[in-house]
Design a protein with these regions (language model features):
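NAD(P)+-binding Rossmann beta1-loop-alpha1 motif at the extreme N-terminus of oxidoreductases
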Residues: 1-62
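Rossmann-like NAD(P)(H) cofactor-binding subdomain of soluble oxidoreductases
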Residues: 57-69, 73-116
């Protein structure tokens, strides 16, 4: 069975906590975790649990079917347009940021994007 690829934009408190939870669970064998953070030392610290660091936001979207937006709301405007070209009909975007609606995320990426 092929591993499900899950990517995280942001490896701060929330993003890293979710990644550590997945890595420490029964799901860990079924999932490949990827992360990008503008502070590379944050993704480097997650290598010990098997997280693959990506070089850019766009790389996360290219690599992963599921993309968690674990960034601060004020970072959305600059970050979301960088994702648009890589989003396909199979991509699922999961936002954990307060106040960011699916409609706003679609308006900054692709109108038909799957957003939770």
């Amino acid at each position: 069975m092929e591993q499900v690829k899950i990517g995280f934009l942001g490896a701060g408190n929330m993003g890293s906590a979710i990644m550590r939870g997945i890595a420490g669970s029964k799901l860990s064998e079924q999932v490949a975790l990827y992360a990008y953070d503008h502070m590379p030392e944050k993704t480097a610290a997650l290598a010990e649990i098997g997280v693959t660091a990506c070089a850019s936001e766009a790389e996360i979207v290219k690599q992963c079917k599921y993309v968690f937006l674990a960034i601060k709301p004020q970072q959305f405007e600059a970050t979301l347009p960088k994702l648009a070209d890589g989003i396909t009909e199979d991509t699922v975007i999961v936002s954990i940021a307060a106040g960011m609606t699916p409609d706003y995320i679609r308006s900054q990426t692709k109108p038909n994007a799957k957003v939770i």
